[in-house]
Amino acid sequence: MKSYEVNFDGLVGPTHNYGGLSYGNVASQSNSQQASNPREAARQGLAKMKALADMGFKQGVLAPQERPDVAALRRLGFSGSDADVIQRAAREAMPLLVASCSASSMWVANAATVSPSADTADGRVHFTAANLNCKYHRSIEHPTTSRVLGAMFNNEKHFAHHAALPAVAQFGDEGAANHTRFCRAYGEAGVEFFVYGRSAFDSRYPAPQKYPARQTLEASQAVARLHGLSDDGVVYAQQNPAVIDQGVFHNDVISVGNGEVLFYHEEAFLETDAVLGQLRAKLASKGGNFQAICVPRAAVAVEDAVRSYLFNSQLLSRDDGSMLLVVPEECRNNERVWAYLGQLTSQGGPVKEVKVFDLKQSMQNGGGPACLRLRVALKEAELAAVNQGVIMTAPLYDTLLQWVDRHYRDRLGEADLADPQLLVECRTALDELTQILKLGSVYPFQRQP
């Protein structure tokens, strides 16, 4: 049976704005309070989805969340009508309103961790929604994330869904942004690679000093248990705390893996040789030939990697066995990074081509190509069991473009978030979107009695 890696990209929501909410994310902080263009952001994301689908890659869409999150504001003591809640929050606690309007769910690499059926004890694809408890604006996402994933992968024979881990710092979980998988073929058993920033209960592990380590070892271990993964199919690695302090807030900012290949920066991990040795040995036991591509600091400094998002790229397998690296425009604009990529594609390794996309609206908030997608390896029967309304096609692309143009503003500043009409616009748009994507009632406003 054939198997595929399907990339489900997050559709940018109508409240896309630059709130500067993500401490430790250099781009998010440095572009705080700029005016955003939600319509352009959504169109940029859709253009990437359509281009990759046109190239033959399997591509899906993951819906955005209801924002502003009025229910979250009510839990914080704001009362009255929805308009009252928004306007009072704007007067008394603008940072809370900004957080409740965040469109950060577009970065669906943080939506969940996914284990393919070939790796799990019960032979189903497993999903665990990420609690994202390090940042308030993201910690409110997982209930809707779980409902959306449940509506997309809604066949119990093939798919198992787990609730987010306990929402405490000891189990901080950032989803697939700190997880990748190596395999000879997508439908065969592979090795799942969990990267953490600190240990919650063992003080012998080092930790960053400036920025928070968002993923704990204990969270990664819990997800592996929930998914029924075997010890011979899992490797845990600690991210280098020094690079977290340089703005590498998730592992997908310093490495990317696919198939049998890990593309990583020299400074990405602690005890790199031991980590690579485990990956090589465990993948070999499953018939695979692990290949590591190390980018030396002499070629690309960590600062350049963070600024360009070289590693927040998509490493995609072509039918001929070669790989394509999808990078943001910022890589072409960085002289050192672009020179390195020229060498990479000409030296006879697996990466044969680099494709550049303009994702500036997302990049200015600290999210590149890899942030925008959740990878799900599926066998043919599993892909057929996915809600087909979310699979990217030419007609769906056209429908979504028209939907965006109808409902999205082309400029959004902080003051606009206090406009109750924005909530009406968002709910109208999302109500229509659930019909387009055949999701049913996944949003809180659709579920109210």
From Swiss-Prot:
Pfam families: AstB. The active site is at 174, 250, 371 (nucleophile). Residues 27-37 have a biased composition (Low complexity). It is an enzyme of class 3 (hydrolase). Pathway: Amino-acid degradation; L-arginine degradation via AST pathway; L-glutamate and succinate from L-arginine: step 2/5. SUPFAM superfamilies: Pentein. Substrate binds at residues 19-28, 110, 137-138, 214, 252, 365. Its EC number is 3.5.3.23. It comes from the Bacteria. Gene3D superfamilies: Succinylarginine dihydrolase (3.75.10.20). One of its GO terms (biological process) is arginine catabolic process to succinate. InterPro entries: AstB_sf (IPR037031), SuccinylArg_d-Hdrlase_AstB (IPR007079). HAMAP family: AstB. Belongs to the succinylarginine dihydrolase family. Homodimer. PANTHER family: N-SUCCINYLARGININE DIHYDROLASE. This is N-succinylarginine dihydrolase.
